[in-house]
Amino acid sequence: IQMNMQEMATAVVSKLPVKIIILNNRFHGMVRQWQDLFYNGRYASSDLENTPDFVKLAEAYGAVGLRANTMDDLDGVLKKAIETEGPVIVDVPTYRFENCYPMIPAGGCNHEMILEDPPELKQKQAGGTKVTPQDKDTVLTA
């Protein structure tokens, strides 16, 4: 979202009923996932520990900002977002190293789709992935 946040201004001015749900892992998530899968976890410009407060950012644009702080909050927050007129940003904190599947590797075909973490990545994550204090407060995990 940070690569095209300026579009929120257009959504507000045009009163578009756009609902944006940010699965916020404080990374450029897909970039980090590629760096894990294809570059042995060598992160370059993907770790965003100092992400903005997306609720305040939405409000700065004149939109509505919501956050689901727990799994119990999620249904109510999503319902409120849908019922709200105009643009809404919903911030959903997630585990920093959660991956998003399915995905197709660069230059790959549909039959080469990756459906889950490969065993070596699962083992690496189970054996010592750094969990930050913020991760203990996340709402969505595998």
Identify the residue ranges that each predicted region occupies.
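Thiamine diphosphate
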Residues: 1-142
